[in-house]
Amino acid sequence: MNEHDLKSWLHACGFDLAEPLSAHLNDTIKNATTPLMHAARMGNAEVLNALLALGADPRLLNADSNGALWFACFADSTACAAALIQAGAPFDTQNINGATALIYCASAGKTPLVKLLLEAGANAALMTLDDFTALELAANRACMKLLKEAEGAAYA
């Protein structure tokens, strides 16, 4: 994706970025949403990778303490999630409810993303504010199996 197309996409999404673009990649709109978070939420790997290549920060959190990785998981985009993990996005960040991306993915039955997060080293023992782990919230048998295996490996 070239810079002109990226600027057009950003403008269409409500980001009014000044020149040079690289100095404003982490500017925010409503709810402290960055362009990277928005691209992740849309599951747009092309835009997400272009933003990362220009230096967008994958560690930033919005007003709810969700980061771009959370939004990639919400969008069910394994490609975006993998790119963000590779770029250094934190995967154990807990949002205002104490949920991590892994807890969200397990509770939503997003098995490929649960597998990706566990392989990246996500902590399956973290709990929500209500004291639930990803395993306890697993929405399907496949997620439950992956989480039980991770739990067993943690105690081995």
Where are these regions (language model features)?
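Ankyrin-repeat-protein effector appendages
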Residues: 1-15, 120, 129-156
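Ankyrin repeat structural motif
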Residues: 13-19, 44-52, 77-85, 110-118, ...
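Ankyrin repeat A-helix N-terminal signature
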Residues: 9-12, 38-44, 71-77, 104-110, ...
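Intrinsically disordered, low-complexity regulatory segments in ankyrin-centric signaling systems
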Residues: 1-42, 49, 53, 154-156
